């Protein structure tokens, strides 16, 4: 099962403009001033779900420290992505609440689409049959775009493997997604996605 929600035009324009500003004069800058950071790898999250997150940062060239920026933004991003996987796959009872907690992580313009595509984004229609999910490997790679001193957007590639238990036995749970995030108040929101679950996620 797969689902795709295109990035809204306004977001594409904003990211394009910011990237254009970031790349201005790039060839004239010394190597140390380049805006792509060495990966900053966060420690696994506490608890049964251990998400390995690698973060890079891109931003204005002058006065921007990509390594420090990546290190600073990683904890919040780690919490957001861990919560995303938790409510999507480790809490089958979310189905009884209409996936309210999960859908709240999406930007309002794409929530209706996400609700229609839960089978590719979360446990979806099989959730009522699932009694528990044992997490396996979980990994993510994020590139965060900064505007000034603040994160503005991020592209995240995230994968999760687990084992679901039902009354009939157990089976694999797999997802591979590319999430386009926007930063705001109170925090990160998913503005667009391309997600595959089950056999499609191989």
Range-by-range predicted roles:
Residues 1-11:
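Bacterial N-terminal signal peptides that target proteins for export
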Residues 5-7, 35, 63:
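Positively charged, low-complexity intrinsically disordered regions
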Residues 18-21:
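C-terminal motif of bacterial Sec signal peptides marking the signal peptidase cleavage site
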Residues 23-48:
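Short, low-complexity, disordered segments immediately C-terminal to signal peptides
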Residues 55-128:
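Core segments of small alpha/beta cavity-forming domains
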Residues 96-202:
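Structured, amphipathic secondary-structure segments that form assembly/contact surfaces
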């Amino acid at each position: 099962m797969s689902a795709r929600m295109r990035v809204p035009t306004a977001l594409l324009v904003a990211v394009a403009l910011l990237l254009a500003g970031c790349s201005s004069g790039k060839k004239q800058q010394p190597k140390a001033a380049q805006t792509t950071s060495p990966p900053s790898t966060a420690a696994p999250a506490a608890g049964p779900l251990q998400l390995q997150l690698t973060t890079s940062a891109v931003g204005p060239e002058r006065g921007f420290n990509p390594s420090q920026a990546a290190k600073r933004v990683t904890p919040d991003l780690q919490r957001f992505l861990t919560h995303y996987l938790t409510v999507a796959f480790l809490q089958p009872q979310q189905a009884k609440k209409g996936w309210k907690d999960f859908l709240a992580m999406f930007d309002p313009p794409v929530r209706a689409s996400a609700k229609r595509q839960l089978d590719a984004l979360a446990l979806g229609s099989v959730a009522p049959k699932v009694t528990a999910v044992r997490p396996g490997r979980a990994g993510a790679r994020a590139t965060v775009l900064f505007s000034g001193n603040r994160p503005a957007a991020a592209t995240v590639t995230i994968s999760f493997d687990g084992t679901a238990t039902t009354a009939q036995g157990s089976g694999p749970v797999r997802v591979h997604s590319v999430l386009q995030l926007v930063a705001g108040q109170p925090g990160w929101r998913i503005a667009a996605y391309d997600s595959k679950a089950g056999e499609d996620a191989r």
